[in-house]
Amino acid sequence: MSHGETRLTDCRIPASNIIGKEGKGFILAQERLGPGRIHHCMRWIGICERAVGLMCVRASSRELRPNKFLSEKQTIQNWISESAAAIYGARLMVLDCAKKIEVHSTKGARKEISMIKFHVADVLMKVLDRAIQVHGALGMTDHTPLSFWYRHERGSRIYDGADEVHKSVVARSILRDQLD
């Protein structure tokens, strides 16, 4: 897995190795979370694109009966187009957020950072779910990367702040802006 855990007990750090001011580590870490969340979101968008590619290959090759393919079903076509539109929108949101961080700093893009975090994670889970559904039982096996991605990336809605926390940040910001 991509996340490890390290426990340090009675660890002493020489003063020359301290980054930033003593006692201000959380603030420093918060400054790095925004760009880190952009990284996660772009990685999730890449997974979404791969999942749509696998979904298209499977739908185009899965024969329901002679010369009748799964890709001809309107529901499957809807899933493909909805997934593509969601990915496109997610990418634009992430690029806009990155620009805001560049221009206004992480603090100035706090609302947008929270929006991309929960929105792109939601897009990821929906796209993976559709791709698994198109693959049928095969999608639940390790013969494709889909089930691994689904299991591994389900945490996207929890780590780095649960969706509900980020939605609360966004709502409070919007309420504050609307009431000013």
Model segments located where?
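Gly/Pro-rich active-site capping loops and adjacent beta-alpha segments
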Residues: 2
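Alpha-helical interface subdomain recognition
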Residues: 5-11, 24, 30-180
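Cytochrome P450 core scaffold surrounding the K-helix E-X-X-R motif
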Residues: 17-22
